[in-house]
Amino acid sequence: MRVTTSFPLGTLRDTPSEAEIISHQLLLKGGYIRRVNSGIYAYMPIMLRVIEKISTIIEKELNNIYCSKLLLPQLHPAELWKKSERWEGYTAGEGIMFNLKDRQGKEFGLAPTHEEVITSIASEMINSYKQLPLCFYQIQTKFRDEIRPRFGLMRSREFIMKDAYSFHSSKEDLAPFYEKMEKAYENIFKNCGLDTVGVDADSGAIGGAASKEFMVTADAGEDSILFTESGSYAANIEKAVSLPSKEIPLIRSHEEWIETPNQKSIVDICQNNNLDASQIIKVVIFLSLIHI
């Protein structure tokens, strides 16, 4: 009786048809979440308890590296995004930002991320390098107009995200803090009982000189990673690079004309003339006609 009163679970006997992966199925059947609309979910009491415990773990690690928690607005004026030249990219075409106009016709967007707002605030409050470094973080609801919401909470239109923003006087000051933040993330995942792989990643629309993602390997997901057997290198498939192929020296000691009839590609030439691709230079000439 007490369990029912404290945690009204609302479990399901059958698996909902829209649940494609096991995590989504278990969250729905276990009464952790309830679907409100496509990509929109209600967090039920037992799920909220889980979120609060995870938040406590996150806060402890970030407070240990002197980050300050705050709460930023979810409704952003378009001017801030236009100033950073990201408004069009986030709202036009397949942009992921929900946007609207108020009664006065002013444009706003529902936050998919908070770089613009926190940068605006920091520019007003930081007057000297002596105030640096500074790091702010929040655990806040985000909105993204996903083209195809799927996999439950994995790709939804409304979700909770922890994001942190730090400000530094130089790159030399940033580097050691980046390492501290990386270690904090490792501790967070460890304390949550997750085995992760740190991989190089594409910064995407957010940008940045470097980006690292912590991946949990699973059968279900939307990302793929490539890694070496030794574990010395791992990267998101969008960012992964390979070592250049070993060059094979050209044996011929003198220049020689070679006929290449019906050999339309480098592969054809290599196969018909016992050559390696590293021994060939391809010259392409473009003819441009300019009308004035």
Name these PLM-found stretches:
Residues 1-290:
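TRNA-recognition modules of translation machinery and tRNA-sensing kinases, especially anticodon-binding
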